[in-house]
Amino acid sequence: MITIQQVTTKKQQKQFVQFPLDLYKGNKCFVPPLYADELAMFKPNYVYNEQADSIWYLAYNEQGQVVGRIQGILQRAANEKWGQSRIRFTRFDAINDKEVADKLFQAVENWGRELGVQEIVGPLGYSDMEREGLLIEGFEYLATFEEQYNYDYYQTLIEDLGYQKDVDWLEHRLTLPEGGLDERIMRLSKKCMERYNLRFDETKSMKKFLKKYVNQIFDLIDYSYNELYGTVPLTEALKKQLLSQFKLLIRRKFISVIIDEKDKIVAFGIGFPGIGEAVQKSGGRLTIPTLLRLLPLLNKPKVVDLALIGVVGEYKNKGISPAMLPLLANMMSSVEYMETNLNLEDNHAIRNMWKHFGSIQHKRRRCYIKQLNPTQE
């Protein structure tokens, strides 16, 4: 007999955050989020509360053990932006048991019906700055710190409940060709930069770089990602939090921007050192031993995770894609490979760029959709 309880106590909050750590204990591919960041979402002043409402549920077996969890989100800003009537599900984790999944999703779906919304989609977090998508290919690969890992049986549990594909994301692993990028690409890049009087910013100091460009970068993220699936505008509070979180990970050599003659950014790429293994060993807790493991990975990583890449709108149709390739190559020059993280499968402009590198498409993630109030025939 499985019972479902809404998370209302501090004890349950800790159980909610702890459960995936227990479920994936010993798994070589799972990388947890930071434990403190997950607990923070229960605080009344959580950064997303100004644009979203949330509910959390736990599933217990007859012995009182946690066997599953799920979160529901009413992302008001997303519904307003896209003209939709949706809730999102996220942070679904469970043992391989149909009853557990059925009852967890039933709880979230009923919450959505009480709110009067028409659809449920997910896995999607509060924004695309959170982990999103259900892994359906690539279970043998280590997850990046930015993305979620899940067992392969999740797909069956979810699809058996009537959920259907809404969108897929693809992930690639890129390597720099021996000898660097093709000479023709380098010539095209140079011509492109000269034609529009563009150049790479060469500010050495990370502090000076952020002071000079951080506001531009956030504006460009909002602009260049505006039309992508499920995105919501960045609030000022969220920008402040993201900057605080990213300062731990950001290294100057993994941020590359192309600027015009007025020092305005026209294209950018941001990568994070791959820290999955270090976080994996700590269970997401930033202890002193964890920090000691992190430092070498931050300064001399084997892998760089591509976090963000974008072009200013007016330059998208000017053919500056060749100039973006050296930008990425610079980020990859000191590592074994780059993880692209999520690219929508129909984002051909981005995916075509990967053809100029050694590239394997090794992971696929899916966002599902289900009608909560289907029309009666």
Where are these regions (language model features)?
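Acyl-donor binding region in acyl/amide transferases
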Residues: 80-162, 282-357
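Acyltransferase donor/substrate-recognition loop-hinge adjacent to the catalytic core
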Residues: 148-229
